[in-house]
Structures are given as C-alpha cells and as structure tokens.
C-alpha cells in the first residue's frame, strides 16, 4: 500500500478460514519477520484455540528461524503454499483483493496513523462486508 507520502507500507493479515473474518491485520514500513510475529501475537490474543494451523506463502518472513520458532513455541502448525502457486493461498489472495479494491483504493488517507487505525479495525469491517453486504 502507498502511504500519503508516497512510500510503501506493507500489510500482514490473518484470516479465519471458517468464516473468512480477519483475525488480525497490521501494517509496517517493512515486510519482515517482526511484522509477521506481531500480527500473529494479535491473533493469538483475540482467538484462544488449542490447535492453530497457519497457512502462508513461502515469504522470507514466514520461513525465518525466528518465525518458525515463534510458531513452535506457541503450538502453531505451519502450512505453506508451493513456491509460485498462489492458488494454494486463494482465500488470503481474495481477502487482499477485496481489501484493496473496496477499502484501500477508495479511501484517502491523510496520514499513516489513519491508515494503521483503519487496518486494525479491518477485521470487523471485512466481516460485515462479506457477511452482510455480499450475502
């Protein structure tokens, strides 16, 4: 995503495949392991499941030693798409498509704080959009 100052801002979101709701969504100036871990921490605080399977692409942030160990320490089973096969991660790709086309691309953000605040609330917004407006 582009910030109001023209620089890129990266998003990491976690969705629940059961109802397609966004459990956690976080922005950062860098697409790195810290962004992935911090997003996962938010998800773990919101949802208290005894077993969690986290499916992602093979981005360096998800394959890093720190993230793999974070998952092990929190009893999270990692699942990853095959390299170069975005269809394995279709629900997440669809989420980002909806997020960008219906919210990000039609909203004028005056500053980064506003962009981040909306992103933190995206779980509620997307759930309502998918389950009330579309259905």
What are these language model-derived features?
Residues 1-135:
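Charged DNA-binding/catalytic regions of mobile-element recombinases
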């Amino acid at each position: 995503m582009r910030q109001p100052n023209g620089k890129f801002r990266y998003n990491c979101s976690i969705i629940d495949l059961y109802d397609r709701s966004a459990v956690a969504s976080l922005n950062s100036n860098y697409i790195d392991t810290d962004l992935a871990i911090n997003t996962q921490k938010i998800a773990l605080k919101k949802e208290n499941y005894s077993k969690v399977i986290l499916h992602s692409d093979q981005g360096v942030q998800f394959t890093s030693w720190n993230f793999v160990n974070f998952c092990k320490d929190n009893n999270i089973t990692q699942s990853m798409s095959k390299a170069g096969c975005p269809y394995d991660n279709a629900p997440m790709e669809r989420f980002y498509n909806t997020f960008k086309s219906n919210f990000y691309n039609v909203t004028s953000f005056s500053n980064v704080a506003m962009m981040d605040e909306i992103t933190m609330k995206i779980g509620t917004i997307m759930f309502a959009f998918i389950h009330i407006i579309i259905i």
